[in-house]
A protein has these predicted regions:
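Amphipathic, well-ordered alpha-helical segments in soluble domains
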Residues: 20-21, 48-55, 82-86, 109-113, ...
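Alpha-helical bundle segments that constitute or directly flank the non-heme di-iron/ferroxidase center
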Residues: 13-18, 33-62, 82, 131-141, ...
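Long amphipathic all-alpha helical oligomerization modules
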Residues: 169-200
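Basic/polar N-terminal segments that are highly enriched at the extreme N-terminus
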Residues: 1-6, 10, 218-224
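Acidic, carboxylate-rich catalytic segments that either coordinate divalent cations
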Residues: 196-224
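Active-site-proximal alpha-helical scaffolds that flank and shape metal-associated catalytic sites
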Residues: 67-171, 200
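Short alpha-helical hairpin
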Residues: 9-34, 52, 177-186
Length: 224
């Protein structure tokens, strides 16, 4: 039986394939990505992950299902204890300071992506917001699985790849997929279409995120 997320996966494939094959990922696996570009990516991702974690708690506040609430609460805490902690290890290796973090402007694409997810919740529904969060989980897992066999000659990049191919991370992805299917079963056809729309938009923002990082996007880019 084809599930709701099976349908999402099929619809998003053109965008996801572009992400897997994006020059950012290709250069990272080849060990050719400038460290300044990875540094830029990490600084932007710190903002993104912080808001991503908050959204887990905010969505949980609007749900009634105990299992769903528990997963989202643990997801929010896991981001603090796990993925964000990994990023902190990267920051230490790259000598990224708290002052540098505080002074780094949020790039337009990162800003808009986060606002898109908040809009899915506050101008939409918790089910829609769950669907908007799913591509970040799922796409990174697919990228990790796609490039793990090749790896990267740069140890920092190899650590990044291994984060998203780990058994623990894959388990979280599978739980998020199950939660999205559950959410889809609770709403009508019109709302499932809205869930589909935000999923595709999040997938497009994921693709834009690589390009943002490669170009070191800033707000001046909007006026050029």
């Amino acid at each position: 039986m084809t599930t709701f997320t099976d349908q999402l996966h099929e619809l998003a494939q053109p965008l996801w394939l572009q992400s897997v094959n994006h020059p950012f990922i290709k250069q990272l696996t080849a060990g050719e990505l400038p460290m300044s570009t990875f540094r830029y990516y990490l600084l932007q991702d710190r903002y993104y992950l912080s808001e991503f974690g908050k959204l887990h708690d905010l969505i949980a506040d609007q749900l009634d299902d105990p299992a769903a609430i528990d997963f989202l609460r643990k997801g929010a805490q896991g981001l603090k204890n796990g993925e964000i902690a990994v990023r902190k290890g990267f920051f230490t290796q790259l000598n990224i300071t708290k002052n540098e973090i505080a002074l780094t402007p949020i790039a337009p694409t990162a800003y808009n992506y986060v606002n898109h997810m908040y809009a899915a919740l506050y101008r939409g529904t918790p089910q829609r917001a769950i669907s908007a969060l799913l591509p970040c989980y799922w796409l990174y897992n697919e990228i990790g699985k796609a490039v793990i066999s090749q790896g990267s000659p740069v140890s920092l990049y190899q650590q990044w790849i291994e984060t998203y191919d780990s058994e623990g991370y894959t388990d979280s992805v599978n739980q998020m997929i199950q939660l999205t299917n559950l959410a889809a079963s609770q709403v009508d056809k019109a709302e499932r279409q809205q869930m589909t729309d935000v999923f595709i938009k999040s997938s497009a923002y994921e693709l834009g995120y690589w390009q943002m990082s490669l170009k070191h996007e800033d707000w001046d880019a909007l006026t050029k």
